């Protein structure tokens, strides 16, 4: 964004956006902006959701955290009905990996959630881990077609938070803890994957762990 502290101009590696936010910046650059949210933050009937969805030309709130199939159908319809020559900015908030860790066709019941704030009889770190991993694997299969359409574009996959599964007596998120602040980040810039390089601190952490077994 303009005045964000990055002084470079448009180049082969970057370009500058101007606007109230990133989505507005892409719209001003001529992009078709398409977005879909699953978690309640994006509920367009709320004040917060209306603010988050307003910058998009097209936006769909799924209504719950287990509607990825509907979201992908809606996005595909938007892509088919817009000018294929116009660049697209697509935002997708996936809910299945969010509590209660459930996806369409899952072999377990949606409720009770294995992870709730402050704990409870239904809480289980083992179930939380296995169900979230299963949801992630299912999501991978569903996203394949959409990602393939943008394989030569810039793609960013991340999470807004992690979850606590009993660490230090804590559960779920909405709290400051290393488990909630650790998130995945995968990037492909203009078709090329970004490979991370180990930092000195990470290298020392690996060495310290190895020493425990020597």
Please annotate each region the language model reported.
Residues 1-214:
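Catalytic domains that recognize anionic headgroups
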């Amino acid at each position: 964004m303009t005045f964000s502290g990055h002084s470079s101009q448009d180049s082969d590696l970057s370009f500058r956006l101007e606007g109230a936010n990133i989505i507005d910046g892409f719209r001003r650059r001529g992009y078709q902006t398409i977005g879909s949210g699953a978690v309640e933050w994006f509920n367009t009937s709320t004040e917060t959701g209306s603010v988050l969805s307003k910058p998009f030309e097209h936006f769909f709130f799924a209504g719950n955290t287990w509607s990825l199939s509907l979201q992908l159908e809606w996005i595909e319809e938007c892509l088919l009905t817009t000018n294929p020559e116009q660049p697209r900015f697509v935002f997708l908030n996936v809910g299945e990996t969010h509590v209660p860790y459930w996806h369409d066709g899952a072999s377990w019941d949606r409720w009770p959630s294995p992870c709730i704030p402050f704990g409870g009889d239904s809480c289980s770190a083992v179930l939380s881990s296995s169900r979230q991993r299963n949801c992630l694997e299912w999501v991978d299969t569903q996203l394949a077609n959409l990602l393939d359409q943008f394989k030569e574009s810039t793609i960013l996959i991340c999470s807004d938070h992690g979850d606590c599964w009993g660490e230090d007596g804590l559960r779920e998120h909405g709290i400051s803890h290393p488990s909630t602040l650790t998130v995945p980040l995968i990037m492909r810039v203009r078709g090329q994957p970004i490979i991370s390089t180990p930092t000195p601190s990470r290298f020392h952490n690996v060495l310290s762990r190895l020493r425990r077994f020597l």
